[in-house]
Amino acid sequence: RVPLHTTLTQVLTKEQVEKNTNIYPGRFIWGVYLARHQLTKQAIRKNPQIKDLRIKVTGPQSLQISVKENALLGTAVMDNDTYAVLADGQLQRTKNADNGIAYKRFDGHKKVLATTAAQLGKLKPAIRNGISSVSYQPTKDYPDRVIIYMRDGNTVYGDLNTIGDKMGYYPAIAASMKNKGIIDLQVGAYSYDYGSKDK
């Protein structure tokens, strides 16, 4: 029978992992071990927050489950439903909003939101944690435009398809600015102060 040890990385509880994997204390150890690949696929399918799962025999009667989670980036409210936005672009219906990135103006644009989230999921946590909110604001000239409001007071204009790569330049550009302002990463990369006519 299985004494169960679970290694978690962020927000999933031991109970959530047991429920999603159908592995629990008292279950026959070798049955779990032989079905580990199927149980891993099942857990990932049931809960998109599980990115990967490893099941390891640690003794004659014990298992260890290691869970790698999809980072929870923030939340989006679309069509009166609240979604947890995950780093790989998946959306998971949720009842409570967290304090991560607020995704705004994505109503009716689930694919656009998923693409934007997957791009922001590429960012280093130091940059990602500096984002307060992201707003989808397409224009005639820039149909894939997102506007990112940073916690440090700057605003970033970007293309939702490339923002994950271009935001890597943000710390250097922001450090070189004398005043708070706009950093435009839609085409190329340049910045200007708020209220400046010189764009």
PLM features: what roles do these ranges have?
Residues 3-5, 18-20, 52-56, 62-68, ...:
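Soluble periplasmic/extracytoplasmic beta-strand elements of cell-envelope proteins
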Residues 154-199:
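Extracytoplasmic/luminal low-complexity segments enriched in Pro/Gly and acidic/polar residues
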Residues 8-48, 93-114:
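Periplasmic/extracytosolic POTRA-like scaffold domains at the N-termini of outer-membrane
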Residues 5-10, 58-60, 68-72, 87-90, ...:
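Solvent-exposed coil/turn segments that connect beta secondary-structure elements
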Residues 2-5, 30-79, 85:
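Periplasmic polypeptide-binding modules associated with outer-membrane biogenesis and secretion
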Residues 65-138:
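Extracytoplasmic segments of membrane-associated envelope/inner-membrane machinery
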